[in-house]
A protein has these predicted regions:
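N-terminal secretory signal peptides
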Residues: 1-10
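Long, histidine/aromatic-enriched segments associated with O2/redox biology
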Residues: 14-407
Length: 407
């Protein structure tokens, strides 16, 4: 996480003040009367307080929660608009959302928030808004060709309850309390206009640095190969001049709910797991990489063993997911989920595969087709949910989200 990702808002002062008050005389014991400096054994400010008060900017050309460092907790919230949808309804919806998001990301509660103390712990909160075809049509704008359900893949066992909707809210923060509070406040504000379709909650390992991969519940290092979205590969993430004008500086989100059969995965030895993945489990390095290599080491897809077989199996996940053209890359921002199991089952766990890109049909579909054809991990994984959303451009000062959509 870079310094530019985070700033410490006014909420930190309140947190610090509370901490000092609670410490009372015990805190003063480390000081001599009138001494200008703390005692030698004073550990200094608690870094957890700074993390709790950390904020990320809302205003700008692009929305937060995409190219910035993933937080530890997430909720993907899908809603349908109630009744007919026209430009008036869309403007009202986006006006309410813009005001509430602006306040919450700054560590302030919305106007109707009766628990503003919870909003005062933003914990790097980001709130990202995506829309479906019905909202685009209601705004009177043309939709991009890719804003539609993905084509069917042979491995899919999709459940209607996890399908696409009119509106998506991605709520991410480094505190589960912050995520829960922000989610509730947004839903309360939208209650007259929307009905809730589904909520998918996820988590991932906390990391200090930006762009670091996570481990999913298979123990697999996930999200290792990412485009340079802050440099040469920006066009792979952000919509440009070949897209509808209202979507420029926006993006596309593909959200796939992938159920992982941990019960049968437990029966697989580590060597077989590494063969299926194409990477070493301990470091995430390709199985062709030399000792000491990390997850960013390039794979040797041509390497063969003494019998003439590929070292990286023809069905290994790494090989099937590997880009075969420069445009077959996208920004992965996945989260794991672990929900209560159904009766008779030991687990209901998996991956919320969230990927951002400029054009899902051109970038994502070819990769997913190769995975569906022959990925060895298909033995233990089943896609049960799939949705595509247009991620709105950001809102500059004085604008609402989706301003250009309604122009």
């Amino acid at each position: 996480m870079t310094a530019s990702d985070l700033t410490v808002g006014p909420a930190r002062r309140g947190v610090l003040a509370s901490a000092v008050g609670a410490a009372g005389a015990a805190a003063l014991a480390g000081w001599t009367a009138g001494a200008p400096h703390p005692a030698a054994n004073d550990p200094g400010p608690d870094p957890r307080l700074a993390a709790a008060g950390a904020t990320r900017p809302f205003r700008g050309a692009r929305q937060a929660g995409i190219a910035d460092s993933p937080q530890t907790y997430a909720a993907f919230v899908a809603l349908d608009l109630a009744g007919a949808v026209d430009a008036t309804v869309v403007r009202r919806l986006l006006t309410v959302l813009t005001d509430d998001i602006d306040r919450l990301m700054a560590g302030r509660g919305p106007l109707t928030d009766q628990e503003p103390e919870l909003a005062g712990v933003p914990a790097a909160l980001t709130l990202t808004v995506g829309i479906g075809p019905r909202v685009v049509a209601g705004g009177g704008a043309p939709a991009p060709a890719w804003l539609a359900p993905l084509p069917p893949f042979t491995v899919d066992r999709l459940e209607e309850r996890w399908s696409g909707t009119d509106l998506l809210l991605q709520v991410c923060a480094n505190s589960p309390t912050t995520v829960a509070h922000a989610q509730r406040r947004l839903l309360t504000g939208l209650a007259p206009l929307t009905t809730l379709r589904w909520v998918q909650r996820g988590f991932r390992e906390p990391h200090e640095g930006p762009g670091l991969p996570m481990r999913n519940l298979f123990g697999q290092v996930d999200g290792t190969v990412q485009p340079d979205v802050h440099g040469l590969d920006e066009a792979l993430l952000w919509c440009g001049g070949d897209q509808p004008a209202w979507l420029r500086e926006g993006s596309a989100l593909v959200l796939r709910r992938i159920r992982m059969n941990l019960d049968t995965w437990d029966q697989v030895d580590r060597l077989s797991r590494e063969n299926a993945i194409g990477r070493r489990l301990d470091t995430g390095a390709p199985v062709t990489a030399p000792p000491g290599a990390d997850a960013l080491a390039p794979p040797d897809l041509d390497a063969q063993d003494s019998l003439g077989f590929h070292v990286i199996d023809d069905g290994a996940h790494l090989r099937r997911a590997h880009a075969q053209a420069p445009h077959e890359r996208f920004l992965r921002r996945p989260y794991s989920y672990d929900d209560p199991p159904a009766p008779g089952e030991l687990s209901d766990s998996g991956l919320l595969f969230a990927a951002f890109m400029a054009d899902p049909v051109r970038q994502f579909v070819p990769v997913q087709q190769r995975l569906a054809e022959k990925d060895l991990l298909n033995i233990w994984t089943t896609p049960v949910g799939s949705a595509v959303f247009a991620i709105l451009p950001g809102a500059r000062e004085g604008e609402i989200l989706g301003e250009a959509l309604l122009a």
